[in-house]
Regions:
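Active-site proximal helix-loop segment of RNase H-like, two-metal nucleases, encompassing DDE(D)
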Residues: 216-238, 249-251
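Extended, low-complexity cationic-aromatic segments
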Residues: 73-163, 269-274
Length: 279
């Protein structure tokens, strides 16, 4: 069918200056091409629906056929194995990252709670009171979160967080695997010097564009929905206090995220890459 054929082509390939098709533009194009005398967008939508076509929708992807990270498969396999193999009692896997530029916005009027027939009401106008950075580590075995807040985000602040982890993690844990991206802050000379003097810590870096492999990102999503969606904080100190309070509440009922060999196999199939996990 001509409509389906056109819907499966990019508009610029048929001489149209559009980023994507919608039902109105497809209807207009069919008439201009003299395929039909007239057709409504509603009819176009019904035909597309019968073929499960929605050319106005998009999602981002990375083709495995384009050369990128030469160690892509090795790095992915390393991280997935950490998540799925049985850890020894002396081992721990922590997923580490930063949630940056958190703004303590002070509303000009207090936020009002929900009432019957009314949602939560948030004052539209606010005052910015600077910004704060949250360093967090997610324990893949227990779901416990370690957190540190700082006004700046440099190697110095990251090392402060590493020192906190070193103090908080029991001495019987002799191997701490830290999963994190390879930002300069994570791989700079100061951090490498710290790492050389703390033998129980080992860094693992997923490939570029693989933030989805870092489990703390899932926890950041929960934090955003449950604590930061309504931003109403007097200042940076108040924001830091609320963040640490949320972490404490989370840790009272902490749970890990379920990364199984079966789920990892599905992920790798979508990446078009075979992956043999360790037994």
């Amino acid at each position: 069918m001509h409509l389906v054929k056109i819907a499966c082509e990019r508009p610029d390939e048929v001489g149209r200056s559009l980023s994507h098709w919608d039902c109105t533009e497809l209807a207009r194009h069919l008439v201009a091409d003299q395929v039909v005398d007239s057709i409504s967008p509603q009819t176009v939508q019904r035909i597309l629906a019968s073929h499960k076509l929605k050319p106005w929708r998009k999602h981002l992807w990375l083709s495995s056929k384009v050369p990128r990270d030469a160690d892509f498969v090795t790095r992915v396999k390393n991280i997935c194995t950490l998540y799925t193999r049985k850890l020894a009692p002396h081992e721990m896997v922590l997923c580490v990252d930063e949630k940056t530029s958190l703004q303590p916005r002070t509303r000009l009027s207090p936020t009002l709670p929900a009432q019957p027939g009314l949602p939560v009401r948030v004052e539209h106008e606010y005052q910015r009171k600077g910004a704060l950075n949250l360093f967090a580590a997610f324990d893949t075995r227990t779901g416990k979160v370690y957190a540190h807040t700082a006004e700046r985000k440099r190697q110095a602040e990251f090392i402060e967080f590493l020192e906190q982890l070193d103090r908080d993690i029991p001495a019987y844990i002799t191997k701490v695997h830290l999963v994190m991206d390879n930002l300069r802050m994570h791989t700079g000379k100061q951090v490498q010097a710290w790492l050389a003097n703390h033998a129980r810590f080992k860094f693992h870096h997923p490939p570029v564009h693989c933030s989805w492999m870092n489990q703390v990102e899932q926890w950041f999503s929960i934090l955003q929905r449950k604590r930061l969606a309504i931003a109403d904080f007097a200042d940076k100190a108040a924001l830091a206090e609320r963040l640490h309070a949320f972490v404490k509440e989370w840790n009272d009922h902490a749970h890990p995220f379920n990364w199984t060999k079966k789920s990892v196999t599905k992920i790798m199939a979508k990446c078009e890459l075979p992956l043999a996990l360790a037994a």
